[in-house]
Amino acid sequence: MYRKILVPTMGEYMDELIEHTLDLLHGREAEVICLYVVDTSVPFLTPKKVKEMMVKELTERGKEILRDMEKGLTGPENPNVKFRGVMLEGNPADEIVKLAEEEDVDVIIMGTGKSLVDKHLLGSVSEKVVHYAPCTIHLVRTV
């Protein structure tokens, strides 16, 4: 059914995403690409040094999250999962859609992830991905 799965994550609700992905696979063979996007869209007046520190911290956090996702998705209990971690910089929604297109993924599994206030004011990443993704999307309710 699904041979290539994209799982974007910011680290929140990681367990739910792992569980949903493994449930969807039912032990079948698949490549799972976990994506962490370092969101570089900081307010315009943010000093360069502050932005650099933020990107560095987010990059370190991303490495840790991708390691944790790999541990949760692979191992002796999941021998049919081929894991690949990817870290990109940019706008999360844009990078998710772009990678889904480039990798020709079958499905994106992602959380809803933001509070109602954030969704109303900023729009959510998942909402943008739903509108522009080239494939099926499974949204995991995480709020």
Swiss-Prot record:
Stored Pfam families: Usp
PANTHER family for the chain: STRESS RESPONSE PROTEIN NHAX (PTHR46268), UNIVERSAL STRESS PROTEIN UP12 (PTHR46268:SF6)
Protein name: Universal stress protein MTBMA_c15380
Family, similarity comment: Belongs to the universal stress protein A family.
Alphabetical list of InterPro entries matching this protein: Rossmann-like_a/b/a_fold (IPR014729), Universal_stress_UspA (IPR006015), UspA (IPR006016)
Coiled-coil region(s): none
Taxonomic superkingdom: Archaea
